[in-house]
Amino acid sequence: LKIALPLEENVHKFKENKWTVFEYPKVLKKIKTVFDWREYPEDFKEQWYEYINEEFRRREEGFWYINKDKPTYITGTHYMYLQWSKIDVGQPDFREANRLFFIFWTAVHADARCYGMCYLKNRRSGFSFMASGVTVDMATISSDSRFGILSKSGADAKKMFTDKVVPISVNYPFFFKPIQDGMDRPKTELAYRVPASKFTRR
């Protein structure tokens, strides 16, 4: 299987010569929702439009950087996983095996002839967190869609949801978070929709 990668452009170089998480500006950390963002003055928002647009571009197009003196491409979903996901040990590490997984997954997702992928894995490979990252990434850019978790038991599926999917969603910055109905840390479903309101008679 041959998978074409985007042209090698705007290659970022980290000081450590390897993947490093970009620091999230402290002033933006205080903003939890798009509603909070709207309350800020326009001159403040103007300062951050370029930063936010660049994050959306990386999510859409992927990201080139120098990894141990070698130009390396990661997909947008992989970028979201490395930069914005929170797992049991904190931020995920870059692994070449994971990079290949995300590239293959992106090709599978783009191919309308393909019904999915079979992935044979070993223990502690990080697959559950990667799959959770893919789920949150897709769910937050899709409309009128449902994303489920299938496991060997309902309890295991629920544990993956509460321990992996929800923390990744919570860790997303406000500009990637759709409007959410319900609690911040739900037990059964993440509902990205406008909260229901009651009809009242006047």
Whereabouts are the PLM-identified features?
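Phosphate/NTP-binding elements of NTP-utilizing enzymes
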Residues: 1-202
